[in-house]
Amino acid sequence: MRVLGFGDNIVDRFVDRGIDYPGGNSVNVAVYARRLGLEAAYLGVFGDDDLGRFLGESIAAQGVAVDRCAVRAGETGVSVLRVDDGDRVFLGWNGGGVTVREPLVLDDGLLEYVSSFDLAHSSVYSRSESELPKLAGLDTLVSFDLSSEEEFRTPSYLDRVCPHADLVLLSCSHLDGAATRALLAEVVRRGARLALATRGVDGAIAYDGRVTVETPARRVADPREIIDTMGCGDAFLTGFAVALLRGGWSAHTPPRRHLIERALREGAETAYGQCLVEGAFGCGRPTGQPAVASMWRASEREK
């Protein structure tokens, strides 16, 4: 089985540690799938700067293929964070750099490449929405991370993504159970075949239009063991999707309740393990430079 991460890559800069880590939603899913024993590749755009080379080399070192990626003139995306009591705190970013500004367009050759994978994953940070309809004629399953921001919950945005997605992930730790279930129902009504909501310590909920399945979070016995929560949602999605694939999920075979239940448990276990990992998948190096001046701070943005 083969999993493709299509879209975003970014450097996660932890200012409290002075360390840069490779990351990005699409990258992380590919790396985690590889660590779970599947073949994996990443398809996207790297900047032609030192950080872009750092990302490409770090991803390849995980056994994830990057040979079909593009390298373009421009800066690499940088996200600035710190850790407070094990939780990541997002401070700002530079807009994603050339990866977001000039996203990859799927031509016939790349579509043939994508068709060789069982699952292709993308996200709101990938600027891949316009490419999703091109995947409709393939037997490749499509998963998409809808994140947590309200701008990605509007009817117009959901209608761009959901009809083309076999699985969507929603981060819902800020919502109660009723609001989470209502959101899951909406994305399925708008075309997603299966919707997964992760709710942090409150576990996760999956809905396919027929059945609703829930699972508790896998708790860390000693919170002091938690290194940071970077990549935990991506890890949950990957563990969930890999379990579905191994259970027979395909473009022509939707998962039944018992398989969804098992996949939720696998997702929770994978997310638990991710809490004990530094950054998204390690591979950190000293930053050597401060956060760039163009980055906004969340507290200022909300004013």
Predicted regions and their residues:
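Active-site metal-binding loops of divalent metal-dependent hydrolases
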Residues: 8-9, 235
